[in-house]
Each structure stands twice: as structure tokens, then as C-alpha cells.
From Swiss-Prot:
Record flagged with keyword Mitochondrion: yes
Superkingdom: Eukaryota
GO cellular component: mitochondrial intermembrane space
Name of the protein described by the UniProt record: Cx9C motif-containing protein 4
Motif (Cx9C motif 1): 7-17
Transmembrane segments: none
UniProt family annotation: Belongs to the CMC4 family.
Segments forming domain CHCH: 4-46
Disulfide feature: C7-C38, C17-C28, C39-C50
Source organism per UniProt: Bos taurus
Length: 68
């Protein structure tokens, strides 16, 4: 049986929040932050749900390292 994603609960909370708030992301910042905290607790690649945040962080690092 496949192992459950460790941050699935937080991802579901985001979906519930977005649905309850007409998909206004600004109203769900607290639950989004909880998912970020969950993702930070696990090694890269451990959570499929966190892969979007991991990609976002990689892009930020690339931009910081790119000479202007």
C-alpha cells in the first residue's frame, strides 16, 4: 500500500479554505503557511504535495544567483 503524503492534511485544509472563500488566496494565508511549515519538516522529494513549493524555492534561488 502506498504511503500517505505527510502533508496531505494541510493540502486538504487549503482546498477547504479556498472553496469556502471563493478561491481568494489572501484569505487562506494561514493554512498555506501551515503547508509550508509541513514541507520544511521533510526532505526534498518526500512529499509530492510539496513539490510546487520546492520548485518555487529553486526558482527564487536561481533569480538571486543570476547577475543583473
Amino acid at each position: 500500500m502506498p504511503q500517505k503524503d505527510p502533508c496531505q492534511k494541510q493540502a486538504c485544509e487549503i482546498q477547504k479554505c479556498l472553496q469556502a472563500n471563493n478561491y481568494m488566496e489572501s484569505k487562506c494565508q494561514a493554512v498555506i503557511e501551515e503547508l509550508r511549515k509541513c514541507c520544511a519538516r521533510y526532505p526534498k522529494g518526500r512529499s509530492l504535495i510539496c513539490s510546487g513549493f520546492e520548485k518555487e524555492e529553486e526558482e527564487k534561488q536561481t533569480l538571486k544567483c543570476t547577475p543583473q
